[in-house]
From Swiss-Prot:
Record keywords: Nucleotide-binding
Protein name stated in the entry: Nucleotide-binding protein Ctha_0558
Family from the record: Belongs to the YajQ family.
Tagged with keyword Nucleotide-binding: yes
Lineage, highest ranks first: Bacteria, Pseudomonadati, Chlorobiota, Chlorobiia, Chlorobiales
UniProt xrefs under InterPro entries: DUF520 (IPR007551), UPF0234-like_C (IPR035571), UPF0234_N (IPR035570), YajQ-like_sf (IPR036183)
Species annotation: Chloroherpeton thalassium (strain ATCC 35110 / GB-78)
MF annotations from Gene Ontology: nucleotide binding
CDD domains linked to this entry: YajQ_like
Length: 165
C-alpha cells in the first residue's frame, strides 16, 4: 500500500450563497424602519468583485454593514472574505464605503500554512500551487490531523478543503 493521499486547501467564495445573502440584505434594507430616510444602498460590481455601500451618515452605514455581515453568517459565508475600505464622503452629505471580496490564498498566507504543516513534524508535504496549497501524505489520519490544525489557525482568509483523495 504505497499510494499517497492528498487534499487542497483553498479560499473560495460561494458566489450563489453570496448573491442570496446580498439579496436578503437588500430586502431588509428596504424594510428597516431606522434606515427609511437614509438613502442607503448596496451595489455589487461582479467584474471587480466589489461592494459599494452608500448611506446618509456613518451610523446608518455601520447598520448596513451589520446587515450584510449577519446575512452572510446565516448563509454560511465567512466574513473574513470581506476587505473593508475607508469610509469616504460622497455627494449630498452622504458617505460611501467600498468592500472588496477576497478569493484565493496569497503567497504570504500560503507560506504560513506550509510552515505550520512543516512545524507539525508529521510525514506530510505541503506545496503551493498558485492560489491553493496541496497537502499530501501516506496516512489519512495524518492528513486529518493537519486539517483540524489548519481549521484552528487564525488566518485572515477563510479556508476550505477540496479534492480529498
Amino acid at each position: 500500500m504505497s499510494s499517497t493521499f492528498s487534499f487542497d486547501v483553498v479560499s473560495k467564495l460561494d458566489m450563489q450563497e453570496f448573491d442570496n445573502a446580498l439579496n436578503q440584505a437588500k430586502k431588509e434594507l428596504q424594510q428597516r424602519y431606522d434606515l427609511k430616510n437614509t438613502n442607503s444602498s448596496i451595489e455589487f460590481n461582479q467584474k471587480d468583485m466589489q461592494l459599494t455601500l452608500e448611506s446618509a451618515d456613518e451610523f446608518s452605514l455601520k447598520s448596513v454593514v451589520d446587515i450584510i455581515e449577519s446575512k452572510m453568517i446565516k448563509r454560511g459565508i465567512s466574513i473574513k472574505s470581506l476587505d473593508f475600505g475607508k469610509v469616504e464622503p460622497a455627494s449630498q452629505k452622504s458617505v460611501r464605503q467600498k468592500i472588496s471580496l477576497k478569493e484565493g490564498i496569497d503567497k504570504e498566507n500560503a507560506k504560513k500554512i506550509t510552515n505550520a504543516v512543516k512545524d507539525m513534524k508529521l510525514k506530510v508535504q505541503a506545496s503551493v500551487q498558485g492560489e491553493e496549497v496541496r497537502i499530501s501524505g501516506k496516512s489519512k489520519d495524518e492528513l486529518q490531523t493537519v486539517m483540524s490544525a489548519l481549521k484552528e489557525m487564525d488566518l485572515p482568509v477563510p479556508l476550505q478543503f477540496t479534492n480529498y483523495r
